[in-house]
Amino acid sequence: TGRKLYYISAEFLIGKLLSNNLINLGLYDEARDALAAVGKSLSDIEEVEPEPSLGNGGLGRLAACFLDSLATLNLPGDGVGLRYHFGLFHQSFEDGVQNEKPGPWLTAHSWAEKTDITYPVELAGKEYTARLYKLAVTGYEGRTNTLNLFDLDTIDESIVHDGIAFDKTAIDKNLTLFLYPDDSDEAGRRLRVYQQYLMVSAGAQLILAECAARGCDYHDLADYAAIQINDTHPSMVIPELIRLL
């Protein structure tokens, strides 16, 4: 059966997906011509597609490139991360002053598909339910892998106010609102740790569940799964996997 790679990262800067998926599936020209036949432009549609706010810089782009290459090379490799609602933030300048606002991208037609799969995650003595979303990663004329994204059903976007301010202590409502929330105070630092733990605990449970579905004996886990940690954010997956086993 071979081993499957799980690439755990706090960021996945995957960019807009419509044109990329059409090209990888060999359907770009067909889609462009079909739209042109009814007086529409594919490029206009590409312009209004919201970009998934799942990453910010080089770390996220590296993760996205790895996933793209794995799929193109027909190698079994899935990503594991968080389904941020607003990403980092949307920056604008008014009268020479920087303004930070939420950058919403999630819609009813998001590429990330909601599943019925959930995992319990305990934070500060309270149990939360991590919901799995799956986003298809298409390779160029290759296989399709998956970016597994975790979120809480209880997240409340309405608590964000005055730009990107929010109650950092309301974990059930804020946990996946932003990528890299402000950590200048203790509440912010705790929130970041909770984010990272949600990602690695749910991710580790996903890995073990998929391994079990393939008939894996956990003593032979290394023959079924390889885990890549992208920077320090997912490093808690090591003790968490030990704890679960």
Question: Where do the protein language model's features map onto the residues?
Answer:
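A conserved ligand/cofactor-binding region detector
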Residues: 1-245
